[in-house]
């Protein structure tokens, strides 16, 4: 039974996901349905965590919008995500960057890795 579930999940995994880690700034293209129309909405922020594996894998991106911190959690393999772009790679020493919630302004910056 477990093998069948794993095979079904494997068929639903997206193949075009770029390799990004916490600390990277990502731009997520999300499909939004408004009435009869479907449009693409961008969310650009720092990836502060990745958790889970397989079909249940998620990541959380954080940005500051008009002085207010906004965090949004996305399932990695959802069909609602059109694509994920990596804007810049950040150098961090933690897997979960929850400490950024307490930082304001320049203290919340992350050092960039040149690749």
Swiss-Prot record:
GO biological process: translation
GO cellular component: cytosolic large ribosomal subunit
Record keyword Ribosomal protein present: yes
Highest taxon above the source species: Bacteria
Transmembrane intervals: none
GO molecular function, one term: structural constituent of ribosome
SUPFAM superfamilies the UniProt entry points to: Translation proteins SH3-like domain
InterPro entries: Ribosomal_bL19, Ribosomal_bL19_CS, Ribosomal_bL19_sf, Translation_prot_SH3-like_sf
PROSITE patterns: RIBOSOMAL_L19
Keywords, comma-separated and alphabetical: Ribonucleoprotein, Ribosomal protein
Function: This protein is located at the 30S-50S ribosomal subunit interface and may play a role in the structure and function of the aminoacyl-tRNA binding site.
Family in the record: Belongs to the bacterial ribosomal protein bL19 family.
Protein name: Large ribosomal subunit protein bL19
Gene: rplS
């Amino acid at each position: 039974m477990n093998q069948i579930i794993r095979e079904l999940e494997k068929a639903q995994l997206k193949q075009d996901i770029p390799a990004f880690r916490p600390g990277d700034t990502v731009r997520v293209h999300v499909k939004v349905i408004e009435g009869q129309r479907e449009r693409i909405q961008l969310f650009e922020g720092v990836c502060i965590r990745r958790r889970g594996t397989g079909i249940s894998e998620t990541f959380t991106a954080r940005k500051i919008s008009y002085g207010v911190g906004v965090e949004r959690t996305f399932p990695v393999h959802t069909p609602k995500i059109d694509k994920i772009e990596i804007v810049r790679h950040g150098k961090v020493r933690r897997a979960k960057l929850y400490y950024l919630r307490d930082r304001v302004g320049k203290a919340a910056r992350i050092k960039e890795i040149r690749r």
